[in-house]
Amino acid sequence: MDPAAGLTALAYASGVTVALMVAIYVCSHLLLRYGLVPLSAAFSFSGFNVPLFYLLILPGTVVHELSHVLACLMTGVHVRDVRLFSPQANGVVGWVTHDTADPLRRGLIALAPFLGGSVAIYALIRFVLPPTEVDPLTSQPVDLALGFKAAAATIVGIVRSSNLHEPKTWFGLYLLFSLGYAVAPSRQDLHHLVAGGLMVIGLIMSVIVIDGWFQLRLMQNGLINNAAANVAVALQHLNALLMLACAGIALGTAVIVPVAVLSYWLRRSLAAR
């Protein structure tokens, strides 16, 4: 048995987590820029339908900001001001201001929408859209490709079994699009995540160098590896949620972007006549 198995599992699970977060971030911004924005422009007589755009992003924005609030409460950071949905002229639609925190807690607060949005998408799929036998909270995907393939198959199966004649189905898809937009971090959140991530990487590299230089054999320590294995299991559950969220956002992007672009093109063509 590999004496560093726990740390190896943790390193792999962490890599999967980062890969999924990057994928969610990319899909979320594609959904916003090439889906929700063109769709709002297509159904407008004045260039851009602001009320429709706000309606599309409302649920997701509320979940995004609530995730920050809950993270502040759980980490003991005092919240100064909360606006769950308050569109401003500069493009900001919601915010949470809090006291200054250390890099670790600041990073956890910035990460909160990933978890909050993924949990919201999970709840949506379990309780609003047609039921599925796959439960991400009880699954532990080890392989990234197989895990994402299973999550995508779950989402596609749900859509295929949906009754498009029921308002509940369209309401569920609307929430899926909105939540997909809001799962990704904002620019300020991303700044905190990058700063915190670089600090963590620097700390890990320092420990590895010190361990190798002084032959401390920390990588083979049983207690450290057991703790790392437990953290890896927790990350695998998180990755299951992130995979489901990523698959849902990817599907939403694949559906709404062509519709939005086509609608916008038709509107421009009709307006030019």
Model feature map: region roles:
Residues 2-37, 89-270:
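Metalloprotease/metallohydrolase-associated module, dominated by Zn2+-dependent proteases
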Residues 32-102:
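Small-residue-rich helix-interface/hinge motifs
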Residues 273:
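Active-site glycine/GP-rich loop and adjacent strand/helix microenvironment
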